[in-house]
């Protein structure tokens, strides 16, 4: 019996989140996409012979900061300074996250003044996240973490040790 991603991911919970019309959830999912986009395009823009390299480095740093903002579990398992943890904990509401993403988007939009590169995608994605958080803020929607996507190990259909032993 082979393990597949479907055994670990709760697709019904994902669909439930998408149907919730809670824009903070949409922004959080887009934040996960931002982590990948910022890292990938930040690395890709390190190969320019231009000042755009600085914005590529900033995009990489932004991806790491977004990772800690959107996945707060990492604050507990990674050895970090108290100052950094307190800085990240400032972004626990939709309003502060909207400001956070807006400022990061502005930085990436400024990169276009030097040279139009693939960092425009980073700027667009960060802007979309900021818009989603702004909509959630103005609609007075509660900020909630997406917990419905990964299956709980206590669920009946979660693959347990016996399945892994059978594979081996």
Swiss-Prot record:
Q: How does it sit in the membrane?
A: Multi-pass membrane protein
Question: InterPro entries recorded for this chain?
Answer: TVP18/Ca-channel_flower
Q: What Gene Ontology terms for biological process does this UniProt record contain?
A: vesicle-mediated transport
Keywords from the UniProt entry: Glycoprotein, Golgi apparatus, Membrane, Transmembrane, Transmembrane helix
Glycan-modified residues: 22
Compartments (UniProt record): Golgi apparatus membrane
Query: GO CC: one term?
Result: Golgi membrane
What is this protein's function?
A: Golgi membrane protein involved in vesicular trafficking.
Similarity comment: Belongs to the TVP18 family.
What name has this protein been given in UniProt?
A: Golgi apparatus membrane protein TVP18
Name the source organism.
Vanderwaltozyma polyspora (strain ATCC 22028 / DSM 70294 / BCRC 21397 / CBS 2163 / NBRC 10782 / NRRL Y-8283 / UCD 57-17) (Kluyveromyces polysporus)
- Which gene does this sequence derive from? TVP18
